From Swiss-Prot:
Belongs to the CodY family. One of its GO terms (biological process) is negative regulation of DNA-templated transcription. Residues 1-155 are annotated as: GAF domain. One of its GO terms (molecular function) is DNA binding. It is found in: Cytoplasm. GO terms for cellular component: cytoplasm. This is Global transcriptional regulator CodY. Keywords: Cytoplasm, DNA-binding, Phosphoprotein, Repressor, Transcription, Transcription regulation. The keyword Iron-sulfur does not apply. The gene is codY.
């Protein structure tokens, strides 16, 4: 494949992921096909976001690492010393992607390290490895372009996470602000009684203990359920099953108690 055809493969990957949930495994597969090497997309903390294998490496430690989707901390920390693309690293280097205990088997193994950057920060590392063939300038162009695309997608995913968290917080705050004083008091007692994200509640017992009417508890639960913060289901004489759907809800209740 010529450089243009290989570049188009990466462009297609970028167009596919636009506006969709990021699949780093598919991105790694595309880069493997374009560059012809093993590809590992590693986060700042060494989490293996995605990988694709061109040449199988028979080594138990490597297999375990891929299964656990986590690179060793010491190796990951070392990667951050590399600020620019470092190509064709041999197996004697501390940065080799081949198992050092099998240097004799993988003596012709070459590794290329490409920092993934975006938004003025280091987001992770793209690691390429293969046997017998060095990485050419064309390969490095594709690798750096691929790292840029991966960086854009990591930033996009982070933005989505931040937006989702902001939405969750806003929903919780709106739900709580819709409660009357007595309903809010009832809610605090309900989730003290629940002591977790889900469980059974007997409304009449709480009403008697706290000194509020059962209807206050029912109204409070109804408001929280209509806001999508909880789900509830009557189990007749056993009580009401309650499950928290929004992770921010219990945190907000705790914060209000502290205030």
């Amino acid at each position: 494949m010529d450089l243009l055809t290989r570049t188009r493969k990466i462009n297609e990957m970028l167009q596919k992921t636009s506006g969709q949930h990021v699949n780093f495994r598919e991105m790694a597969m595309t880069l493997r096909e374009a560059i012809g090497s093993n590809v590992f997309v590693v986060s700042r903390r060494g989490k293996l976001l995605g990988f694709s294998i061109e040449e199988e490496i028979e080594n138990d430690r490597m297999k375990k690492m891929l299964d656990e989707r986590q690179f060793p901390e010491e190796y990951t920390d070392g990667l951050f010393k590399i600020e620019d693309t470092s190509a064709n690293i041999d197996v004697d280097s501390e940065y080799t992607a081949f198992p050092v205990e099998n240097r004799d088997i993988f003596k012709n193994g070459l590794t290329t390290i490409v920092p993934i950057k975006g938004g003025g920060q280091r987001l992770g590392t793209l690691i390429l490895s293969r046997l017998n063939r060095s990485f050419s300038d064309d390969d490095l162009i594709l690798a750096e372009y691929g790292a840029t695309v991966v960086g854009m997608e990591i930033l996009h995913e982070k933005t989505q996470e931040i937006e989702e968290e902001a939405r969750s917080k806003a929903v919780v705050q709106m739900a709580i602000s819709s409660l009357s004083y007595s309903e809010l008091e009832a809610v605090e007692h309900i989730f003290e009684e629940l002591d977790g994200r889900e469980g059974l509640l007997v409304a009449s017992k709480i009403a008697d203990r706290v000194g509020i009417t059962r209807s206050v508890i029912v109204n409070a639960l109804r408001k929280l359920e209509s806001a999508g913060v909880i789900e509830s289901r009557s189990l007749g004489m056993k009580g009401t099953y309650i499950k928290v759907l929004n992770d921010k809800f219990l945190l907000e209740l705790e914060r209000m108690k502290e205030d």
